[in-house]
């Protein structure tokens, strides 16, 4: 919800899992948020930009977080397909 000035005034904004599109509840203490940095292809240095991914506890408990993160990085062009 926004006020008259256009600022977001909600107390809690739920996140969605980047891999499954499930809502991450406030009580999902196994969920993680990972920032993947962008690297310049020529110099190999960090550019200061990053992409944020959120993984829910369900994905982590199934042991699929590594595969999900790899798939998301390939989809967003942050890594090469293996």
Swiss-Prot record:
Keywords: Ribonucleoprotein, Ribosomal protein. GO terms for molecular function: structural constituent of ribosome. InterPro entries: Ribosomal_eS21, Ribosomal_eS21_CS, Ribosomal_eS21_sf. It comes from the Eukaryota. It holds the Pfam family Ribosomal_S21e. GO terms for biological process: translation. GO terms for cellular component: ribonucleoprotein complex; ribosome. PANTHER family: 40S RIBOSOMAL PROTEIN S21. Belongs to the eukaryotic ribosomal protein eS21 family. This is Small ribosomal subunit protein eS21. It comes from Cyanophora paradoxa. The lineage of its organism: Eukaryota, Glaucocystophyceae, Cyanophoraceae, Cyanophora.
């Amino acid at each position: 919800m926004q006020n008259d000035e256009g600022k977001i005034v909600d107390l809690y904004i739920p996140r969605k899992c980047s891999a499954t599109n499930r809502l991450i509840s406030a009580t999902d203490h196994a969920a993680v948020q990972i920032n993947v940095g962008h690297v310049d292809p020529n110099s190999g240095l960090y550019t200061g930009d990053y992409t944020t991914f959120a993984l829910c506890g369900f994905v982590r408990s199934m042991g699929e977080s590594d595969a999900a993160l790899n798939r998301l990085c390939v989809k967003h062009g942050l890594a090469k397909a293996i």
